[in-house]
Every structure is written in C-alpha cells, then in structure tokens.
Amino acid sequence: MRIAIAYPPLPSEKGVPLLSQNRQFQWFSRPTYIFPVVPATAATMMKAAGHDVLWLDGIAEELSVEEFDRRLSEFRPDYVVIETKTPVVKRHWKWLREHKGRHEPNTKYVLVGDHVTALPEETMENSPVDFILTGGDWDFLLKNVVSADGDATKYEPGIWYRSIDGSVENTGRFRLDHDLNSAPWIDRDLCKWKLYAEKNGNFRRTPGTYLMSGRDCWHAKCTFCSWTTLYPVYRTRDPMDVVDEIEHLVKEYGVKEIMDDSGSFPVGKFMDVFCSEMIRRGLNRKVRIDCNMRFGRLSAADYRMMRKAGFRLVLFGVESANQITLDRFVKALKVEDIENGAKWASEAGLDVHLTFMFGHAWEGKDEIANTVALARRMLARGYASTLQCTLTVPYPGTPLFAELKEADGLTTLDWDEYDMRKAVTKTPLASEDEIKRAIRDVYRGFLQPSALMRRLASTRTLFDFSFYYRGVRSLLGHLLDFRGGRKGDCR
C-alpha cells in the first residue's frame, strides 16, 4: 500500500496555521513548525509494515497548493491521512470535496484529531471522508485499517467508516489499550525532522526535536483541554527506552534540545529512573530537555534533580490567579502552589514558561486584575522566564464547551471563529477591550526593569542572544496583536 501522511497548505490572510502537535490552534504571523509526534509514529509504523510512505507537510515545507497537489498526485496514494482541528475542519471538508477522486479513484481519505473525535458524525455528513480514526492512538488504528484491507470485521474500536452501500458505520468508542513500548522509534529522516528543528520558539539550542514519553497527561481532567478528548487514559513508555531514544538522537542527528511534549511529564518512579539514567550516561551534558509539568506535585528537590539531569525549560499551565476559576477548570491546584512551584523551579536553574488564559465567562475586572498582577509579579521576581497569553477557547468535546453551550455562553458555533483571534466565549462581566488591555499589560511585564535585568544577566552565549532576540521580536508583535484583537504567544 501507498500511504501519505499529509498536511495540505491552508493559505490564509490570517497567517501560518499552527496545526501539528498543538493543543490550542493558532494562526501565526511568523512561521512556527512543531514536529508532529503521533503522525510521525504512524508514518514509521506504516514503513515498518512494508508500505510505501510519503511525508508531505505542505505547511512546514511552505509549498504552494499546486506543488502540494502535484507531489501527492505523483505518489498515487492508496490512503491519505490528514490531521485536523476545530478552526480548520471546514477547510479540510472543502479540501476533501475538491480532491476526492482526483488522484486515484480508489484512494481512501482519513481524518484524525480531537475535533473529529468529538464530533465524528458531523464530518462524515459534511465531507466525503472515508475513515475517521478517533482517539489519540490513531497511529495504531491506521495500522489496523490498512492491514484489514477493507474487512470491517477486523477493525478495532474507534473507527468510523463508509460501508459498501455508502452508509456510515462505526466500531464503537475508542480504547487506549495499546502498548506504547511496541511503537517504533520515529524514523526522523522519513518524517523530514529538519523542517521542524529550527523555527520553534521553545528551542534555545538548535537543532531541536520532539518526542513523547507518555500519552498524554496524568491529570487529564482540565475541562478546557482539547487533548483530554483524545487521551482520557494516561500511559507511559519505559523510561529506559526513552533515554535510549534520546541517546540515539544525540549521536545520530546531533540534536541539542528535545521537547518531551507529553501533556505532563511522567513523575514518580519514571522521573527518578529517567533522571538518574540521563546523568549516568552523561547525556545531561550533551542535550537539553524541555517538558510540560503541573504545579502542586513536585518538590524543590525534584526540580533540582531535573536540572541536574539536563532539563532546561519547564512549561506550566496557570490559566488564572483566581481559585474559583482553577476549581471550575478542575485544575486540582491551589493559587499558592503556582508561586511556590515556579520559585522552586527557577531557583533550581530551570527556565519556567507560564501560560495564562483570559476571557473566562465568570471573571470580571477584579479577577482579571489578579491574573495580570500574578503574571507580572512572576516575571519581576524571576520566577518565570517566558509566558504566554491566550483567549479562552472551549473546544468541542471538552466539558467547558458542553457547559457553555448549555448555558448559551458561546458567541458562535462557526468553527472558523475558534482560532483565538477573537472571543467565542460570552464575557458579561468584562468587555473584549478590557480583556485585550489586560493581556497587553501582561506582555508589558517583560519591560519591567527587574525583568529586563534578569534577562541580561542570563544572556551568556550566542544561543541565549539569538533566543532572546527572537523573544523581543515576538513581544513587539504581540503588543500589536492584542491592540487589533489578534493573539499569539510570547517566547
């Protein structure tokens, strides 16, 4: 079989779509490309099973629509697999209507991702897609579909498909019972890893790449997170296997920084084994590790161990400085945990990146001011190196979406509008201008004298200078973004 893992170009005046490996979709004015771990694992699985595989990321390769179509047509695929998200799903429906039957009459088209997992019937009705693979283990499901070769009796749970008579069928709710240790290491050459090795705001040192020790978050209860739709169950790889892969990436590809993009990096015994092995092999001196983490679980000693093991950047979701919001989001987090955890991590020598969300339906001026004050205080005290502000987007499939929809708390159900360029959550206690002004105030926190001095004091190498230079460019852009209602992140 001939399998294409494809990201069609999505030309738009809004910018470059940040689609792959992204829990929250954004349009960026400056290109940012994140290595898509599960699609790359799927491609590697297909190649290992003896199939011909085409990795065709028209977004990261910055291909024209014509060039993308030419390459796809020349490959003559049996299956075309496309990852989609809420703000671009209508564009992918249109793409499917235009391309179905164009390349090969028997080509099967497959959609994956959190939106189609939440609303599979919608996409089956609005596009000629042949398969929807629901859940986060769609790489395993793709292998199953291809090996079944049209025999639906062999399909695993979680697959939506069209029967011979055109009717829509499905195999029930997906299960996350696949052994992650059975998945091969990603074939980085097959998946053109260099496309994603430089243009990424997380990396201080390049080339960099991504992997995932777990799928996805050991908390998995935050009501706003779109990936809880994909991964309601948490599993991890063997920590020794993860370290083996890191060693391989360092030796064979010269990788200098690795982002472990598990929703939350595994803690407990996994972290102990991982850190001790990184130190024992001397990898802590050869590569920097970045990861996502949650406040309230690790101690100051844990952060010191991480730093010794080669960790550089730790990303935390704060969302709000108000306990009522943290509780409504089921963050299982106290406000005091935020400042304590960030203090411990930064004192251990880790770079701390914090994410904040604005535009919660139940927050007014005072609550917004609390979050602004916390964010600026974290920068001023050096507890945060970088931060990110986004507008609240309740994605289909999340409890937050269900809650707001039932309460008539959404401004629209037009999925194109769920791209964070403007609010889709009704905020009766604060105007959109007040929310934008608050976000600008947070970003101006980078210009506080104490924050600037800390940046200068930590700039020691050319890597640091380049990293902070990119950050300044982003900061200026985001101050303009929120003046005009656009949004982005700040590194």
Predicted regions: what is each one?
Residues 2-5, 69-72, 78, 199, ...:
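Radical SAM enzyme core and accessory elements
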Residues 3-31:
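Short glycine-rich His-centered loop
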Residues 55-59, 229, 356-358, 391:
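Residue-level recognition of beta-strand->loop/alpha-helix junctions
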Residues 121-126, 302, 362-377:
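Catalytic cores of alpha/beta
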Residues 38-176, 397:
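Glycine-rich beta-alpha loop elements in corrinoid/cobalamin-binding modules
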Residues 12-16, 120, 268-269, 324, ...:
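Flexible glycine/acidic-rich beta-alpha junction loops that bind and position SAM and/or redox cofactors
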Residues 181, 186-353, 360, 370-373:
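Radical SAM [4Fe-4S] cluster-binding motif and immediate context
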